[in-house]
Amino acid sequence: MPRAHASRLAAAALLAATGLSCTDDSNPSSPITADLAQMATKRGPTLTPQTSGTTARLIGVHAVNQNVAWVSGVGGTFAVTTDGGATWHAGVVPGAEALEFRDVEGVSAMEAYLLSIGSGSDSRIYHTTDGGESWDLQFQNADPDAFYDCFAFWTPNRGFAYSDGVNGRFPVIRTTDGETWQDIGDNLPAAQPGEFAFASSGTCTAAQGGKRGWIGTGGLGDARILATTDGGDSWAAYPTPIVQGAPEGASGIFTVDFRDPNRGILAGGDLVRESEVLPNVARTRDGGATWELATPFPFGTVFGLSYVSKAGLPAVFAVARGGVAWSPDEGDTWHELPDFLDFWAVSFANQHAGWMVGGEGRIVKISF
């Protein structure tokens, strides 16, 4: 087995062993202003545990609006709320009982996409238009060496999914109709030996506006950002300063998000040294071309993060197995919430409607 493939599988195994998107801000319940930012900084978030209806480990979450959110996890599990989390409807996709849905993209109360990870045919994309009552298999990977980690969407019908490199090439796929997926790997820079991403929260990809997209990588190679400004027709690769290149192939970028076309944040770490506070957070002000280190996340390796709103606030919420924390200033300072353990992913629709998910079916609503 090639070293890169073995390291990628080892990193996936580490994630499994630890127990191991296009957000809609069109309907915030109040305007986002500097006063609101100051108020949020003073009082911090309100965190409310909710009942998910499942005990499966939840790894993906997408907040569509203040009422609708979708989550996904192991054992082919998904769940959806249409009332702000007061109730959740959980289910298992037929035929996917052995799969891990590491990413979910909600469109509405009725429509969503799920992505499962794994080598070969375990990497799949499912789609529902009836609230999860039935699911169509849209894509099933046929390359035994490809491993799809996450996806991101610009619109309900336009998105892309990332696979780790195979023989120096990233077999990224794209949909322009919400039904079929085409390989656009020739549009991307060459993959470095041993370069891959981490499927820790379904947020190794991000999409913003109508055409901008980003992919965060790591593994045995450098931790790079792959970026497009034209909907995936062309991509460029940019270096980042976070921890990377660990010989075990378990370090790099785990999660990335953008609040506008230029300003974004990424985070990650090293799975082998998961609890160590390393250079694990960086931010950009030029669309991902250059990155500067921010204050390290206080609980070690970051699995997922999200801006509280895509409408302008620099506030960020980040989660890890060792604790969660939020920053009012894009990573300059972190406010710790150490009592919340084993969380994998977080997503906000607006400052009043965010959710984080984790082990044993945990869901917590977050409101600033």
Predicted regions and their residues:
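Residue-level hotspots at or immediately adjacent to binding/recognition sites across diverse folds
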Residues: 32-368
